[in-house]
Amino acid sequence: MAAVTMSVPGRKAPPRPGPVPEAAQPFLFTPRGPSAGGGPGSGTSPQVEWTARRLVWVPSELHGFEAAALRDEGEEEAEVELAESGRRLRLPRDQIQRMNPPKFSKAEDMAELTCLNEASVLHNLRERYYSGLIYTYSGLFCVVINPYKQLPIYTEAIVEMYRGKKRHEVPPHVYAVTEGAYRSMLQDREDQSILCTGESGAGKTENTKKVIQYLAHVASSPKGRKEPGVPGELERQLLQANPILEAFGNAKTVKNDNSSRFGKFIRINFDVAGYIVGANIETYLLEKSRAIRQAKDECSFHIFYQLLGGAGEQLKADLLLEPCSHYRFLTNGPSSSPGQERELFQETLESLRVLGFSHEEIISMLRMVSAVLQFGNIALKRERNTDQATMPDNTAAQKLCRLLGLGVTDFSRALLTPRIKVGRDYVQKAQTKEQADFALEALAKATYERLFRWLVLRLNRALDRSPRQGASFLGILDIAGFEIFQLNSFEQLCINYTNEKLQQLFNHTMFVLEQEEYQREGIPWTFLDFGLDLQPCIDLIERPANPPGLLALLDEECWFPKATDKSFVEKVAQEQGGHPKFQRPRHLRDQADFSVLHYAGKVDYKANEWLMKNMDPLNDNVAALLHQSTDRLTAEIWKDVEGIVGLEQVSSLGDGPPGGRPRRGMFRTVGQLYKESLSRLMATLSNTNPSFVRCIVPNHEKRAGKLEPRLVLDQLRCNGVLEGIRICRQGFPNRILFQEFRQRYEILTPNAIPKGFMDGKQACEKMIQALELDPNLYRVGQSKIFFRAGVLAQLEEERDLKVTDIIVSFQAAARGYLARRAFQKRQQQQSALRVMQRNCAAYLKLRHWQWWRLFTKVKPLLQVTRQDEVLQARAQELQKVQELQQQSAREVGELQGRVAQLEEERARLAEQLRAEAELCAEAEETRGRLAARKQELELVVSELEARVGEEEECSRQMQTEKKRLQQHIQELEAHLEAEEGARQKLQLEKVTTEAKMKKFEEDLLLLEDQNSKLSKERKLLEDRLAEFSSQAAEEEEKVKSLNKLRLKYEATIADMEDRLRKEEKGRQELEKLKRRLDGESSELQEQMVEQQQRAEELRAQLGRKEEELQAALARAEDEGGARAQLLKSLREAQAALAEAQEDLESERVARTKAEKQRRDLGEELEALRGELEDTLDSTNAQQELRSKREQEVTELKKTLEEETRIHEAAVQELRQRHGQALGELAEQLEQARRGKGAWEKTRLALEAEVSELRAELSSLQTARQEGEQRRRRLELQLQEVQGRAGDGERARAEAAEKLQRAQAELENVSGALNEAESKTIRLSKELSSTEAQLHDAQELLQEETRAKLALGSRVRAMEAEAAGLREQLEEEAAARERAGRELQTAQAQLSEWRRRQEEEAGALEAGEEARRRAAREAEALTQRLAEKTETVDRLERGRRRLQQELDDATMDLEQQRQLVSTLEKKQRKFDQLLAEEKAAVLRAVEERERAEAEGREREARALSLTRALEEEQEAREELERQNRALRAELEALLSSKDDVGKSVHELERACRVAEQAANDLRAQVTELEDELTAAEDAKLRLEVTVQALKTQHERDLQGRDEAGEERRRQLAKQLRDAEVERDEERKQRTLAVAARKKLEGELEELKAQMASAGQGKEEAVKQLRKMQAQMKELWREVEETRTSREEIFSQNRESEKRLKGLEAEVLRLQEELAASDRARRQAQQDRDEMADEVANGNLSKAAILEEKRQLEGRLGQLEEELEEEQSNSELLNDRYRKLLLQVESLTTELSAERSFSAKAESGRQQLERQIQELRGRLGEEDAGARARHKMTIAALESKLAQAEEQLEQETRERILSGKLVRRAEKRLKEVVLQVEEERRVADQLRDQLEKGNLRVKQLKRQLEEAEEEASRAQAGRRRLQRELEDVTESAESMNREVTTLRNRLRRGPLTFTTRTVRQVFRLEEGVASDEEAEEAQPGSGPSPEPEGSPPAHPQ
C-alpha cells in the first residue's frame, strides 16, 4: 500500500487480510501501482517528474489547490507553472504549499504525510474518494466522506475480516475503530464511546448503525447463538431498534433523505467476558414542530407516510386513515414510492414485534399517530360579531376523540371555552380562533413527543435486561448535525449548541488533556496552543450570569410580564452586544434578528415564537381530559399533567398587571431541561475514552462521485483535522502503565530485569534499553511510559512472534513426550508378545507329553474344594459393592431433587426480587416527583415571603437611596475638581520633561561631532588596512572552508532566532498596548464629549498622545514587516544549512586535499592578521572613547523612554479613573430618574399586592400543611415498601446460602469424578496386561458358565444403573465440561466397574464386552484426536511454509546484499584495473570535463555578477525604504513637540542618526545575501531541464491523445451495449404486450380464472419494474457520461479564463516592474557611492543580457509548443462533440421507448381496474391457467436472467479488457523507457570500448557484469563534479562577503562580523579583476583539476 509509517523505523505496510470478496476489494485497499509508489519500475515516472519539476500546490478557485512546477523563487514571491494549463503565475511564497512525493499517494493515515498542509490533506482525501476509499485515518481519529451510494464493505465477510485485528493490520474502516474501542474496553476495563460528528447529511446515522451491527456480530453471547432463530434474542433486538427509531424520529430534509431529527446516545453494556448483556437509549431534543409544519421541499416523520402508504384496508378503516393530501399537517408529498413505504412499514412492524411489543400496543401507537394527523384537520372559524372561535364541522374532532378515547362534547368545551382560575374560583373563558389553533398545534406536538418518549422507555425496558451485570459499557453518539439554513430558529440553536459542546470536547480531549497529561507525567513538553478554544461561543449561549447567555436571557424573559420576542432580542443585544461571537444585523432590511459565530460558520437566527417554544404551553383542560382517556396508552403518556404550563399562565404574561409574574419554580423551560440533559451527556462522555469518527459532506447535491474542495476544506478546518494530525505526529499518543508494560512485554526481554524486587519505572527503563528503542520514540513519565504513534503496534507484532515461537517450542516438546510414551508402550507390547510366544512354544512342546496331560486333568480337581469358598467370598464382596452403589445412587437422586428444588426457589425468589425492584423503582420515581414538587412549593413559599419582605423594605430604602445619590453627586463634582488640578500638574511635568529632552539632544549633537572627527581619522587607517586585506583576500580565495561556512550559517541562524524572539516579544507588547490604548482612548473621548466641556485641554493632550501612538503603531508595523522578512530569511538559512550539511557529508574526500592547502594558507593568513591587529591597536583608544560616548547616549535614551513611559502610565490611569467616575455618575443619574418616575406608580401597586399576597400566603400555608401530611403518609408507605424489600433481600440471601451449599455438594461430586478420571489414567496402563491375560482366562471360563450368566445379569443391571447415574452426573457437569470431558468420565466409570467385577466375580466376558465398547469409544476419540491433530499439523505446515518463505525471502535479501557488496568489490577492483588500461580514455574525458568546467565557471561568474548587481540594487531599495520609514518616524516625533520648536541643526542630526541606523540595517542585509543565492539557482536548472521537460511534455501529450481515444472507444462500446440492451428490452416488452393481450382474451373467455391471472400479472409487473430500473440505470450512466463531458468542457473554459486573467496579471506586474525600475533609478542617483562599487560588473552585464535574450527565445519556442497542444485539445473537443451527438440520438430513442412504456403502463392500470371490478365475482381458481401463466412468467424470468447474466458478463469483460489495456500500456511505457536507458548505456560503453586496448577486450565479460554499477559510479562522479562546482560558487559568495566587509571598513569602526563581511567584498573585487584578466587572456589561466577541484592560483 501507499501508506508508509514514518515514525517507526522498519515498519511494514499492513498485509492484506485473508479471504475478502472481490467486489469489496476496490473500496478497502489502496491500488498498487505507479501512483502508489509501487515497485521500481512502476513508480519511476511520477517520482522523476516530481523531482525534476519541483511540484508544489498553489491556490485554485475551482479545485481548491492545483499542482504547479516551481520555476523561480524570490525573496517574497515565486514563479510557478501550472501543471495542467502550462500558464505561469507569480504568487507570494506563503500561498505556495509543498507537495508530497508520489509514494504517499492515497495514504491510509494522513499523519504519515511528509508535507502536512491543507493542500496535501485535501488531495489525499480527494484521491481516495474518487477511488472509492471513503475511510481515512487522520492521526488518532477517522475521517469518512459520504459516498452517496451503496458500497459492498459492510457484509458479514468484511466483519469477520476486521474481527480481532489491530488497526494497522487492516484498511481504514469504521469497523476498525469499533474493534479498537471494544478491545480497549476489555483490556483497560475503561468505558468507551464512539462519537460520530459532522454536518447534516454527512453519514452519521449510517455509521452509527454499522457500529451497532459490528458489535452485535462480534460480542453476541454464546447462549444467544445456540438458537439463532428464536425472536427476542438480545442482539437481534438491538439491531431492530434502529428501524423503529428511524421511523418515528427521522425525516427527509433538504440536505439528507434520512436525517435524524433527534439526538441519541446508545449505551451497550457488556459483561466481564465481553458479551452484550443489555443496552440503553437516551434521546435529546426531538424536533416535534416537524409533526405539524415542514419547510419547503422537506417532509414530516417517516412513520406518517409509512402508515398511510403501507397499512392494509382493514387497518386503515380501524385507524380512520385518509389519503396523504387530505391532511393539513403533511404539506409536502411522501418521501418515496408507495411500494417502498409498504416495505418500510412492514419492516417497522416486524421490528416492533421482535422488541416484544404486543399487538394492542402497536395498534395503540398507530392510533395515536393517526390522531396527531387528525389534530390538523380540525377546522375552526371566527364568529361574525365576536372574536370567539367556533367549530362548524366536528367530523375531524369526532375521529380524533374516537382514536384517543375522549368525549366529543368535553373535548370541544375544553378547547373552545376552557376553565381558568380567577382568584379562588374557576370561570370559563372563550378562546379566539388564533388561541384555539395554537392550542391544537401545541397538543399535536406534545402528543407526538410524549409518544416518542414512551416508545424510547419501552425500548429500554426490552433491551436493558440486567443492568447490574454490566461490567463496562460502550456508548455510540448520533446527534443531529450542524445546521445552517437561510434563517434558523430555536431548534437550530439547540442543535448547534450541542455540536459546539461536542467539538469543544474533541478539542479538549485532543489538544488540552493530552498536553496536560504530558506535563503531569513530567515529560519535557512545550505547551502548544492551536487556537481552537470554543468556550467563548459556549459561554455566549449557556452562561448563567455576568453577563447572562442566550438561554439564561430567554428563561428570564419567560418570567417577565408583557415580554415578547422583540424584547428578548433587544435584551440580548444589550447584554451581549460586545461579545466577539455575537453580531447584530448590519442593515434594517435584514430578516435575521442576530447572528452567532459558531465554529462551523456564521449562523443567522430569527427569534420568532422563541418564548412560546421555550415555555411549551398547553391547554391544561384538554391535557386533563387526555389523562382521563379510556385508552390505556393515552392515559399513560399524559399522566404527568401537573407540571405543564397552562395557556392562562402564558396569557397572564401579556395581560397581567405590571408587577405580576408567574410563579417561579412551577415548571422548567425547554432550554433548562435540554441544558441539563446535555450536561449529563458531556459528563458521561468525559468519563469515557472517546473515539471520534468525523463525517464529511462532499457536496450539497447528494451526488455520488462529486467532491467540492471548498466545502471539504471548510469542514476540515472546523473539525481541527490538521491540528489533530500535528499533535499526533509531535506527541506521544500511546501510553501504558509501568506494571502493564512489564507484564505484557517482559517476554521480549527475558534476562533484562534481575531477580528480586525492582521498581516499575526502573524495570521499564531496563526493558527499553534491552529493546534498543530510539530515545526519540518514547518518554518515561511518573506512572506511565509514552510512545509515539506506531511504536506500540510494532512491539505487539514482536510479542506475537515471540509467543508464536514459544507455542511452537511447547508443541514440539509435547509431541516429543507423546511420541516417547507411545514408543514405550509399543516396547511393552513387544515384550508381552515375546512372553506369549515363548509360552505358546513351550505349550506346543508339552501338550503331547503324557505327564502334562495328567497334570492338566488332576490340577483342577485339586482346586475344586477351594473354589466354593472363593466364590462365596467374592459374592459377599459383590453384594457390599452393590449396596454402596445403591446408596450413592440414592444420594445422587436426593442431591438432584434438592438442586431442582433450589433452582425453583431461586427462580421464584428472582421473580419476586424483580417485582420488588420494579415496585421499588416506581416508588422511588414517585418519591422523586413528590420531593421535586415539595421543593418547588417550598421555593414558591420562600420566594413569596422574601418578596413581601423586599416590598416592605423597598419604600424605606427609596428615600435613603435618593439622599445617598445626591451626596454621591456632590462627591463626584469634588472629585472632578481634583482631577482638573492633577491634569494641570501633569502639564507642568510635561514641560519640564521636554526641556530635559532638549538638553539631551544638544549633548547628543556634541557627541556626534566628535564622532565625525574620529571617522576621518579612521579612514586614514582604513587605507593601510586595505593593502593588507587585498593580500589576505588572494589567500582566502583558495581556502573554501566548509566549516567556516557552516559556522557562519549557525551563527546567523542563532542571531536571527534571538532577534526573532525579541521582535515577537516587542510586537506582542505593542499589540497589547495598542488594544488597551484604543479601548481606553475611545471610551474617554465619548464620555468627555457627553458629560462636560471643561476637559477641553485634556482632550487636546489626548489628541497629541494619539498621534504619538500612531507613530508607535507605524514603527510596530515596520518591525512586523522586518520580522516577517527575518522569518523568511531564517527558513532559507535553515534550508541552506541542511544543504551545506549534506554537502559536508559528500565532500569529505575532496575536503582532505583542500584541508592541507587551507592549513598552509591559514598560517600565512594568521601572520597577516597579526600584522593587521598590530595596525588596529593604535585605534583601540579611540574606539573605547567612542563606545563610552555611545553608552552614555544609550543610557540617556533609556532614561528618556522611562520618563515618557511613566508619564503615559500616569495619564492613562488618570483617564481611566476619570472615565469610571463619569460612567458611574451617568448610570446613577439614569437610575435615579427611572426610579423616581416608577416609584410613585410602584408604591400604590405594591400596597394592593401586599394584601393579596398575604391572603395567598395563608392559603399556601394551609396547602403546605396538607402537603406535609401527604408527605408523612408517603414516607410511611415508603418505609413499609422498604421493609418488604428488606425481607425480600434476606430471603434472597438465604436462597443464595442454600445455592452455595448446593454448589459445594456439586463440587464434591465433581471431585469424585476427577478421582475417577485419575483412576482411568492408571487403568489404561493396566489394560494392556489384562488383555494379555484374557486369552489364558477363556479356558477357565468354560467351566463357570452358570455362575457367569447369573453374574452377567447382575452386571447388566448395574450397568443400567451406572448409565443412569452417569447421565445425571453429565447433566450436572454440562455447564463446566465439554464433550471430551464427558466421554472421559463415562469411560472412567465403565473402567471402574469393570475393574471391580474382574477383582470380585471374575466376570471377564462382561469385562470383555465393556472393553470392546471402551475400545470403540477410544477408537472414535482417537480418530477425532487424529483429525484434530491432522488439522493442527496442516495449519502448522502452512505456518512453517510461510515462515520458510519468509526465511527464504530474508535469505534472498541477504544474498542480494552480499551480491551487491561483491559487485561493489568487483567494481572497485575493476575500476583499478580499468584505470590502468584506460589512460587515453580518461585523458579525453578529463579534457572534455575540463572544458565543461571552464564553461560552467564562466557561467557561474556571469550569474554571480548578475546576482551581485541585483542584490546591491535590492539592498539599496531596502535601505531607501528603511530610510524613508526612519525619516517618517523622526518627523512624527518632532511634530509632537511643536510647542518646543524645531531647528535645522536638529533635523540634520536626525538624518545622521537615520543614516547610521541604515548602515546597521545594511549590515544585516548583507549577512543574508548568501541565502538569496539559492533562489537564483532555478535559472541554471531551467537551462539544464528544458529539453527533458520538452520530451516529457510530448510524451504526456501522446498519452493524453491515447487516453482520449481509449475513452472514445469505451463510450462507443457503451453506446453499442446500451443499444443491444435496448433491443433486448424492446423484445421483452413485445413479449409482455403479447402476454397481456392473451390475458385479455382469456379474461373475456374465462372470468373465473382472473384471480390467479391477477396474481401472475402483479409478478409480471414486478419484472417490468426491474427492467425499467435497469433502463433507468443505463440512462443514469448516459447522464454521467454527459456530465463528465460537460465538466471537461467547463474545465477547458475555466482554463482559458484563468489564462486570460493571468495574462492581465502579467501586464499589471510588468507595469509595476516599470514603476519599480523608475524608483530604482532614482535610488541609484541618491547612492553614488554604491554605484562606484558595482562599476566593475558592467562589462559582464551585456553578456548576461544576451543570455537572457536567448532564454526568452527558448521560452518563445515553448509557447509555440503550448499553442500546438491547445490545437490538439481542440481536436479532442471535436471528438467529444461527435460523441455528444451520438449520446443525444440515443437519448431521443430512449425517450421514445419511455413514452411507449408509459402507454403500456396506462394500459396496465386500465387492466387492473377491470380486474378490481371482476374480483368480487370470482369464486374459483383454475390450476391449468395458473400453470400456463407460471410457465410464461418462468420463461420471461429465465430470459431476463439470461439477459442480466449476459450484461454482467459483458460488463466484467469490459472491465477486464480495460484493465488489460491499461496494464499493457504501462508495461509498454516501462519497456520503452528501459530500452532507451539500455540504448544510452550501450552507446556509452561502445564509445569506451572503441577507445580501449587489448586489456579492455580481455575484461569484456567483467565489464558486462558490472556495467550497471559503472554507470552509477559515473553518475556519482558527475554528482561530485557538480558538488565541487557548487563549492566553488560558495567560495565566490565568500569573496563577495569579504568585499562587503572592506567597503564597510572604509566607513567606520566595525565589529569582527562587519570586518569579515567587508573582507569578503574586497575579495569579490579581486575575483572580478581576475575574471576580467582571464576573459582577456583565456589561455593563460591554469586548467582545472580532473575531479572538479578549484584552480590553483599563484601565491
Curated annotation (Swiss-Prot):
Which residue ranges run through the membrane? none
Keyword presence, Disulfide bond: no
Q: Which GO terms describe its biological process?
A: actin filament-based movement; actomyosin structure organization; mitochondrion organization; mitotic cytokinesis; neuronal action potential; regulation of cell shape; sensory perception of sound; skeletal muscle contraction
Alphabetized, the UniProt keywords read:
Acetylation, Actin-binding, ATP-binding, Calmodulin-binding, Cell shape, Coiled coil, Deafness, Disease variant, Motor protein, Myosin, Neuropathy, Non-syndromic deafness, Nucleotide-binding, Phosphoprotein
Summed up, the tissue specificity of this protein is: High levels of expression are found in brain (highest in corpus callosum), heart, kidney, liver, lung, small intestine, colon and skeletal muscle. Expression is low in organs composed mainly of smooth muscle, such as aorta, uterus and urinary bladder. No detectable expression is found in thymus, spleen, placenta and lymphocytes.
Where is region (Disordered) located? 1-46, 1371-1415, 1592-1623, 1905-1942, 1958-1995
Which residue intervals define the domain IQ in the entry? 803-832
* Any one annotated GO CC term: myosin filament
InterPro entries attached to this UniProt entry: IQ_motif_EF-hand-BS, Kinesin_motor_dom_sf, Myosin_head_motor_dom-like, Myosin_N, Myosin_S1_N, Myosin_tail, P-loop_NTPase
Which residue numbers delimit the Myosin motor domain? 105-800
Domain Myosin N-terminal SH3-like: where? Answer: 51-101
Q: Where is this region: Actin-binding?
A: 678-700
**Where, per the database record, does this protein carry Phosphothreonine?**
1194
Bias class Pro residues marks the residues at 1981-1995
Family the entry assigns? Belongs to the TRAFAC class myosin-kinesin ATPase superfamily. Myosin family.
The annotated subunit structure for this chain is: Myosin is a hexameric protein that consists of 2 heavy chain subunits (MHC), 2 alkali light chain subunits (MLC) and 2 regulatory light chain subunits (MLC-2).
Q: Which disease is it linked to?
A: Deafness, autosomal dominant, 4A: A form of non-syndromic sensorineural hearing loss. Sensorineural deafness results from damage to the neural receptors of the inner ear, the nerve pathways to the brain, or the area of the brain that receives sound information. Peripheral neuropathy, myopathy, hoarseness, and hearing loss: A complex phenotype of progressive peripheral neuropathy and distal myopathy, with later onset of hoarseness and hearing loss. Affected individuals develop distal muscle weakness at a mean age of 10.6 years, followed by progressive atrophy of these muscles. The lower limbs are more severely affected than the upper limbs, and the muscle weakness first affects anterior leg muscles and later posterior leg muscles.
Free-text function comment from the UniProt entry = Cellular myosin that appears to play a role in cytokinesis, cell shape, and specialized functions such as secretion and capping.
Q: What is this protein called?
A: Myosin-14
Q: Which organism is it from?
A: Homo sapiens
